[in-house]
């Protein structure tokens, strides 16, 4: 039986008379590369905000590793292994990538409480930061101010910071948004290569990226789940073509 690491039960979010998410039940399995797609206004980011605790649901439940986390604050969900990135970068622009990673890694080791010691001085923390810089191809940019990095590198840094927190489930909200086309596939390939014990839930509008990345896809329309399945089944689904992809056959078949 496949392990479920993240599960929602009938999540509903209403804003007055508007239902943004409508009885959304979703399962993300261990090691999954799972994509959440849908047209603008489908409720994707609202759903992610409920998963991470930024926005409480009107009704329903969120479970992480079998534990009900519906009422937990965002930082407590992060501590349990539910980590996200944002559609708009959330970075320390005046710090270097090395310094930023030292902050993230140190916070996990509780070293940030030892404020009188330089961040990253600990050999274990320094080695982990160096490993992350190499993994995300940021080594040559390690000592540049983040605000000076090319945009694609800033995107990679944000994902590296999330990975530094040792997520069990990584939620990526359009990680390739604004990135030059030539660099988008590289970003998703880096994410796909994360260890198998890291489950990924991806929101992305670029269908070529989605179908090359995901082993399971959930389609959200008007706040509810239209369908879910493997990429081939989603690509062939006539309702998905009509509502989201249009009538043209996707290039990926």
Where are these regions (language model features)?
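Glycine-rich phosphate-binding loops of nucleotide-dependent enzymes
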Residues: 2-253
């Amino acid at each position: 039986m496949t392990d479920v690491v993240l599960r929602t039960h009938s999540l509903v979010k209403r804003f007055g008379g508007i239902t943004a998410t409508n009885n959304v039940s979703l399962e993300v399995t261990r090691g999954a590369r799972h994509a959440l797609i849908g047209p603008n206004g489908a409720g994707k980011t609202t759903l992610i905000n409920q998963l991470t605790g930024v926005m409480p649901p009107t009704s329903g439940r969120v479970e992480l590793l079998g534990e009900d986390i519906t009422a937990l604050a965002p930082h407590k969900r992060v501590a349990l292994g539910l980590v996200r990135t944002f559609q708009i970068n959330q970075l320390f622009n005046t710090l270097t990538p090395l310094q930023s990673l030292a902050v993230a890694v140190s916070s996990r080791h509780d070293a940030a409480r030892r404020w009188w010691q330089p961040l990253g001085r600990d050999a274990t923390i320094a080695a982990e930061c160096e490993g992350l810089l190499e993994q995300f191809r940021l080594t040559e940019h390690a000592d540049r101010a983040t605000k000076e990095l090319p945009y694609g590198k800033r995107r990679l840094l944000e994902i590296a910071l999330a990975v530094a927190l040792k997520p069990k489930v990584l939620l990526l909200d359009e990680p390739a948004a604004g990135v030059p086309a030539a660099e988008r596939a590289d970003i998703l390939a880096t994410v796909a290569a994360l260890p198998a014990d890291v489950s990924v839930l991806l929101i992305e509008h670029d269908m070529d990226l989605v179908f090359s990345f995901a082993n399971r896809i959930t389609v959200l329309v008007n706040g509810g789940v239209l369908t879910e399945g493997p990429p081939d089944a989603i690509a062939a689904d006539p309702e998905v073509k009509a509502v989201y992809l249009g009538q043209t056959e996707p290039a990926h078949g």
